[in-house]
Amino acid sequence: MEKYLSLSGNHSSNKRSLEGLSAFRSLEELILDNNQLGDDLVLPGLPRLHTLTLNKNRITDLENLLDHLAEVTPALEYLSLLGNVACPNELVSLEKDEEDYKRYRCFVLYKLPNLKFLDAQKVTRQEREEALVRGVFMKVVKPKASSEDVASSPERHYTPLPSASRELTSHQGVLGKCRYVYYGKNSEGNRFIRDDQL
C-alpha cells in the first residue's frame, strides 16, 4: 500500500503515462513536478490524496484544473502550482504582480476550500473568508486578440526617449570628467558626517 509517489522530472506530457495511478487508490502524496503536463491532465480518483505538487509544468487553464481536482481529490489539503502559467508569479512573468497572485490564491481557495497550504504558503483565516465572499469573482479572464485587431494595429516599439531624439540624424552624447579620485586606503563612507552627529 503505497502512500507516497514522486514522478518528478519524467518530462512526460503524455496522458497515458499517468493512467497507472489508478492502481494507487491509497496514495496520500503525489509529486508531479517538471513533467511538461498541460491542460489535458487527467488524474484518476484518489480519495486519500492530501498533497499534490504540479510545479513547473505547462498548465494554463486554472479553472478546468481546479474543477477536476475538486472531483478526483476530495481530501486535498496541500497544492502547489508554482512555475505554471496558471499560477501568476513575478518570477515567471514580468507582467504579473502581487495583486495577480492574491487574486489567484482567492480563486483557488474558492474552488478548493479544504486547502491548508497553497504554493508553500499556509492559508490564512482571512484568505479563507475572502475566498468565500469574493472568490467567484477572482477568475482572471483575458480577452482573446482577434486576427483583425492584430493586423490593423500598427506595430510600435516602446522607447523611453522623447520622439525628437529618435531621429537617425540627431544623435547627441554627453562627455563628463570625474573631478575627484580617491587614493586613500580607508573607506570614505562617512566623510559627510560631522563630529556633532556622532
Curated annotation (Swiss-Prot):
Alphabetical UniProt keywords: Albinism, Differentiation, Leucine-rich repeat, Repeat
Ranges occupied by LRR repeats: 2-22, 26-47, 48-69, 75-95
SUPFAM superfamilies: L domain-like (SSF52058)
Domain LRRCT per the UniProt entry, residue ranges: 96-134
Claim: Repeat is one of the keywords in the record: yes
Record-level GO BP terms: melanocyte differentiation
Record-linked InterPro entries: Leu-rich_rpt (IPR001611), LRMDA (IPR043313), LRR_dom_sf (IPR032675)
Domain of life: Eukaryota
Tissue: In the embryo, expressed in melanoblasts. In the fetus, expressed in melanocytes. Not detected in retinal pigment epithelial cells.
rRNA-binding among keywords: no
Function: Required for melanocyte differentiation.
Pathological condition linked to this protein in its record: Albinism, oculocutaneous, 7: A disorder of pigmentation characterized by reduced biosynthesis of melanin in the skin, hair and eyes. Patients show reduced or lacking pigmentation associated with classic albinism ocular abnormalities, including decreased visual acuity, macular hypoplasia, optic dysplasia, atypical choroidal vessels, and nystagmus.
Protein name per UniProt: Leucine-rich melanocyte differentiation-associated protein
Species, as recorded: Homo sapiens (Human)
Gene from which this protein is expressed: LRMDA
